[in-house]
């Protein structure tokens, strides 16, 4: 065993005896692929992260897209880590839209509904789940495109999915 692993295991054991282990692990869990790569000192290209939904390992491109979309790693109580592949992200977005759709607003109506500027409203792409940036939100507003409320969260179309259609 490597010395760091032994020290980490001893620290985890000590903290678990004190009832602090869950707090310790919560502070230590990386939320992005890059943070996980840095913490493990393993290049991203060498990471093997399974998809939580289909159990397939994400490709290098999918690992990079995962961080680009501002998605977060999924940790289990047993300290297993999962991500979400692109195919499952699209399927999940489609499923949520079909099952939990609430309302559609066009352009700047969203600001009136939420009582705050569009730049302060968090939203994701309705197709790929990418977190929308300010330019994407403003583009949707200016072109009078739809915003959809799904499961109490706003969705729009990102520049990549817009280019595909």
UniProtKB/Swiss-Prot annotation:
A cellular component term, taken from the record's GO annotations: host cell cytoplasm
Major localisation: host cell
Renumbered zinc finger spans (unnamed): 51-88, 125-161
Xref: InterPro entries: E6, E6_sf
Recorded GO MF terms: DNA binding; zinc ion binding
GO biological process per UniProt: DNA-templated transcription; regulation of DNA-templated transcription; symbiont-mediated perturbation of host apoptosis; symbiont-mediated perturbation of host ubiquitin-like protein modification; symbiont-mediated suppression of host innate immune response; symbiont-mediated suppression of host type I interferon-mediated signaling pathway
Family annotation (Gene3D superfamilies): E6 early regulatory protein
UniProt cross-references to SUPFAM superfamilies, sorted A to Z: E6 C-terminal domain-like
Keywords: Activator, DNA-binding, Early protein, Host cytoplasm, Host nucleus, Host-virus interaction, Inhibition of host innate immune response by virus, Metal-binding, Modulation of host cell apoptosis by virus, Transcription, Transcription regulation, Viral immunoevasion, Zinc, Zinc-finger
Localization: Host cytoplasm; Host nucleus
Keyword Oxidoreductase: no
Task of the protein: Plays a major role in the induction and maintenance of cellular transformation. E6 associates with host UBE3A/E6-AP ubiquitin-protein ligase and modulates its activity. Protects host keratinocytes from apoptosis by mediating the degradation of host BAK1. May also inhibit host immune response.
UniProt subunit comment: Forms homodimers. Interacts with ubiquitin-protein ligase UBE3A/E6-AP; this interaction stimulates UBE3A ubiquitin activity. Interacts with host BAK1.
Similarity annotation: Belongs to the papillomaviridae E6 protein family.
UniProt name for this protein: Protein E6
Designated gene of the protein: E6
């Amino acid at each position: 065993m490597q010395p760091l692993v032994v020290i980490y295991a001893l620290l985890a054991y000590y903290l678990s005896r004190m009832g602090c282990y869950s707090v310790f692990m919560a502070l230590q869990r990386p939320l992005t692929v890059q943070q996980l790569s840095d913490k493990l000192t393993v290049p991203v290209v060498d990471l093997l992260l399974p998809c939580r939904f289909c159990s397939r390992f994400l490709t290098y491109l999918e690992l990079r897209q995962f961080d680009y979309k501002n998605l977060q790693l999924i940790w289990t109580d047993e300290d297993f880590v999962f991500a979400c592949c692109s195919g499952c992200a699209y399927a999940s977005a489609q499923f949520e839209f079909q099952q939990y759709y609430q309302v559609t607003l066009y352009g700047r109506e969203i600001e009136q509904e939420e009582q705050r500027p569009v730049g302060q409203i968090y939203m994701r792409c309705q197709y790929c789940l990418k977190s929308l940036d300010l330019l994407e939100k403003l583009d949707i507003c200016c072109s009078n495109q739809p915003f959809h409320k799904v499961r109490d969260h706003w969705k729009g179309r990102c520049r990549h999915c817009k280019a595909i259609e």
